[in-house]
């Protein structure tokens, strides 16, 4: 089996400061090959490293103001990143900078901590690295897979963990059921108007929790 992956922008990436920092000992051809391979594994994480003018999305893209192109791409990427979240244990600085509340300084601090401890196992652990304000803004978008708490792998903000746990308990489920078809089916049947009062929360938080648990 084989997969065809677009190589647009790979050569531009291979000579960029980011590529040189990531692979200082590799030739540009090998850096391009690595970039193309990574696109198959995680397209979003890799494509954010390429400047908009290097992506090659159309014949007339160079007629558009490069600043407008970059601003619009940044907006779209930021929405995508904050929608799907990022794996805090694998995310590059190029990806982390698109997370709400995180700038280069915060990104570097988080990565330095990650490299120091080897692996981050919980969102609570991140609280010791970020300021309270940044933590509150960013933590819902930072995901931890196979960590101490399964909710850390979802888009549920820690402030709403109690709502999630109480919801699970009220329908006879537990954290170990997260991701199961049985739980998904039960969540589909929930009367949100009834449960928002039962759980003493607002409809928006409840709908967000339900969506994230599916």
List each model region and its residues.
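Phosphate- and other anionic-substrate recognition elements at nucleic-acid/protein interfaces
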Residues: 1-74
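Charge-patterned, long linear interaction tracts outside catalytic cores
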Residues: 42-113
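Accessory alpha-helical DNA-binding modules that contact the DNA backbone or grooves
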Residues: 83-214
